Regions:
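Active-site-proximal or metal-binding-adjacent scaffold patches in catalytic folds
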Residues: 1-171, 180-223
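Walker B catalytic acidic pair
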Residues: 176
């Protein structure tokens, strides 16, 4: 796959030059710009022509990220912000609002373990979706999606899922488990999801909001 050539643009902008028919503009969750354009395309003019749209998009992202503003240096876990403190072992103290860990790698390992155990339990609780499922569960650090289901029936979950409130974690598991029966996003798939999580449209909107918050969080960016 041709990934194109990257070049530096103005501050907060990445330009990717590749053989495409038309330019594409993306405002990332952190507010920076990514432009994919043909080799000789006038990127600066393109950005200027879309300045109003860019500012509107940035305002939308700022609104979505409002809950995390001023708490970017705290760990978002189970929908709550915790102060990270050094400790000989991993420990969550809800009363004090702290999470102790000896290192970032240790923190990542323990969060991964927590999520994997929770996913296993949730799959056991919905046998009509998982059925006689014999695939594997993997927890990974991903930058584009909350989870995925392979054609072999293996379920992959983004470590970021553990940052979500409990109802949204449930929804992500239901969503991916439904793919064990429907490997698409067809009407049948959404009907199946709705049988187990009726308010899935609201959940999708909340997932978008939390994605922006996590993208702007310095602790999560270390994983």
């Amino acid at each position: 796959m041709d990934r194109g050539e990257k070049e530096r643009g103005a501050a907060g902008m990445t330009i990717v030059r590749k053989a495409v028919r038309s330019a594409r503009l993306q405002v990332r969750p952190d507010g920076s710009l990514r432009v994919v354009a043909p080799p000789s395309f006038d990127v600066e003019g393109f950005v200027q022509r879309n300045a109003a749209w860019i500012e509107e998009r940035r305002r939308d992202l700022d609104r979505l990220a409002a809950e995390g503003r001023g708490r970017e240096g705290m760990l978002l876990l189970s929908g709550r912000f915790y102060h990270l403190v050094p400790g000989a072992r991993f420990a969550v103290d809800d009363a004090r609002g702290t999470v102790a860990s000896p290192s970032v790698p240790a923190l990542q390992r323990n969060l991964s373990r927590m999520l994997k155990e929770e996913v296993s339990g949730r799959l056991e609780a919905c046998p009509d979706l998982a059925g006689r499922w014999s695939g594997r569960i993997a927890v990974k650090v991903q930058r584009t999606r909350w989870g995925s289901c392979s054609t072999l029936g293996n379920l992959n979950f983004n470590l970021r899922v553990i940052a979500l409130p409990e109802p949204l974690r449930e929804y992500v598991v239901v969503h991916e488990a439904a793919h064990l029966r429907e490997l698409n996003h067809s009407e049948r798939f959404w009907r199946l999801v709705g049988e187990h999580y009726p308010d899935h449209r609201a959940a999708e909107a909340e997932l978008r909001r939390y994605w922006v918050i996590i993208e702007r969080n310095r602790v999560w960016s270390e994983f």
